Amino acid sequence: MDNKLLQFLLRIRNKRLNSYMIAITHLGTGGAIWLITTFILFYLGYRISSVNIILSLIFNGIVCNLILKNLLKRKRPSWISKVELLIKNPKDFSFPSGHASSSFAAALTISFYFKGMGIIFLIIAALIAFSRIYHFVHYPSDVIIGALLGTVIAIVTKNVYDSLLLKYLQENMGFLFAFISYI
C-alpha cells in the first residue's frame, strides 16, 4: 500500500501541483506556520492557548523527532528509490513524520481554544502531512502514525496543562502568571 500510493503520486506530478506542494511542505518545516500563528495569538492576548501550543510542539519534538525516529530508524523512501526530489532530502529518519505530528499537535491544540479556526488549521495540517508523501520523503504510514501521534500529544498536553501546570502557575506563581497575562 505504501509503495503503490507513492508510485501513483509520482505519476500525477505536474509543475503547478509541484509548486503548491513545495509551498505547503515549507509551511510545516521547523513548525514555521505553527510558531508564527502562536506568536500572533500571544501578541493578540491569547497567552494561555499560546503557551499550550508551544508545550505541545516541544513535547511532540521530544517524542517524535528525538525518541521515536532514532529508536525505530526507518529509512525514507527517498533514500531507497532514486527519485528526483523537489525539496531537500531530509537527513533524519522517516517514522513517524515530524511534519505530520507537529502539524496535528499544533492544529488540534489551536482547535481546542478556537473552534471556528480549528477546522482551517486541521486542513492545513492534513495538507502539510500529505505533501510529505507527495515529495517522496515519507511513506503514507509514517504520515498516518505521525498525525495520530500529534493528536494524542495535543490531547495529553491539553489535559496536563489544564489540570496541573495551569493550576500550579495560578496558585504558586501568581505574580508571574499575572505579568505574562498582562504583556
State the predicted function of each range:
Residues 29, 44-45, 72-73, 115, ...:
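Short helix-capping/hinge motifs at transmembrane helix termini and TM-loop junctions
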Residues 27-44, 119-124:
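Hydrophobic alpha-helical transmembrane segments
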Residues 56-69, 125-132, 154:
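Alpha-helical transmembrane segments of multi-pass membrane proteins
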Residues 80-183:
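Membrane-embedded catalytic cores of phosphoryl/pyrophosphoryl-handling enzymes
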Residues 21, 25, 48, 52-56, ...:
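Alpha-helical transmembrane segments of integral membrane proteins
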Residues 41, 64, 68-73, 111, ...:
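Membrane-water interface at transmembrane helix exits
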Residues 38-62:
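Interfacial segments of alpha-helical transmembrane regions
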Residues 1-32, 65-92, 168-183:
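N-terminal transmembrane-helix/juxtamembrane module of multi-pass inner/ER membrane proteins
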